[in-house]
Amino acid sequence: MMKIVLISGKRKCGKDYISERLQRRLGSRSCIVRISEPIKSEWARKLQLDLDALLGDGPYKEKYRRDMIVWSDEVRAQDYGYFCRVAMEEALSRQQTPYILVSDVRRKNDIRWFRETYGPERVITLRLTSRPETRSARGWTFTAGIDDVPSECDLDDLADGFDVVLANDEELDQEAIDILLDRLQLQYR
């Protein structure tokens, strides 16, 4: 049975890092899905931007972040699962794996879509937290209109909580990753 791990957290809390560490341990039995990929692909196509730079982690993406958030919220207002669906369709057309790691869940409706589409028994929620000083050391600076909008704050008050919460303030060794996989009930051996 396919398991889907929905990874969420604030900017610069290590969502990509943890996703990549989990995938490395799970190997070819897993793939990383990014809900932001279809957002960035459509935005780049629409404005004729450099998609590779937009997919990266540098200042180019930050320059367009606020406008992408506004536009993607408009799309979600019409179809809350649109970007989740497109990201999953693209990923599953490339590779079928027992474990899907969705590295950038940001909204309650993202979680809702995955639970409705695949069933709650297949969906595991992982919330990453990091202290503000840790995030700052990773390059985060509070930005009004980005850090105080639903794309960053919607999951702060998730009513039914998360299946697993992980403080990600230090580099995790392999044992910590294995413990996390056990807590997520994912077979890695």
Swiss-Prot record:
Substrate binds at residue 168. One of its GO terms (cellular component) is cytosol. It comes from Drosophila melanogaster. InterPro entries: P-loop_NTPase, Pmev_kin_anim. Keywords: ATP-binding, Cholesterol biosynthesis, Cholesterol metabolism, Cytoplasm, Kinase, Lipid biosynthesis, Lipid metabolism, Nucleotide-binding, Steroid biosynthesis, Steroid metabolism, Sterol biosynthesis, Sterol metabolism, Transferase. Pathway: Isoprenoid biosynthesis; isopentenyl diphosphate biosynthesis via mevalonate pathway; isopentenyl diphosphate from (R)-mevalonate: step 2/3. Pfam families: P-mevalo_kinase. This is Phosphomevalonate kinase.
